């Protein structure tokens, strides 16, 4: 309110001095005015396919541990009327089996069998809960548990810090293959080593959802996603978490007739740039490696040709992008 008062008072004072009639002031400051100018694009590097609970044996082995028997009974007794109870039981017996495995009292095959039953239960619960008018809170996020993990070539902390810091929801979608049906439910992980480096909340017409419909990856083809409305401060707020630097930037001007031109291209940070930011001298590091390689040649641990390849590869790495390059 004080900000608005100051703006209006300043405008009013100047207009009064000039004898100009006061206008109606219409303004929208902040995210709504600047979010539209920027889009984050990144490729998907790999995917972890969610467990489906398939290939469950018809007959249990004789030496099967009791938690596996209990998990099977949970699966057989599961119905739309006892979803919450079955979920709680499945988690309990799954955790019990994990503890037995940690203490060496069950085999890896036995634990794997328990996991298959657990995921079969979770899949059944996900199917049955769609019949409920009101989903229990504990089951609301079960779709994200069953979602694939798509690994994106980006850093949440560098490019989408508000998604992590204040749970800001950004529109996310594929930017190609739009005539194909997106048959996989997924969450998105970045390439940092931080468990918070993921997007698992997405915009939905009903408010929010915990997975995103994406296409299956095709071997040999790139798959690109776009995150929209990121023009509001994301580039300014981003930081060097895991030493992942600024991304490549392309500025595009779109004409009224739909044509466009590339106005400016800015290369993202190189590995050498980031090392310099954190006060490591890339030239000193390279020189240290050069001396070590020379010493290895003199001691006949590597050949001169191998020395050249080592130094060339290291120099290429210093000049390279901080993100994955194919």
Where are these regions (language model features)?
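Charged (often Lys/Glu-rich) extended helix/loop segments that serve as interaction or gating elements
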Residues: 20, 24, 29-326
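Alpha-helix-loop-beta-strand connector modules within alpha/beta enzyme cores
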Residues: 1-14
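Short helix-capping segments at alpha-helix termini
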Residues: 14-20
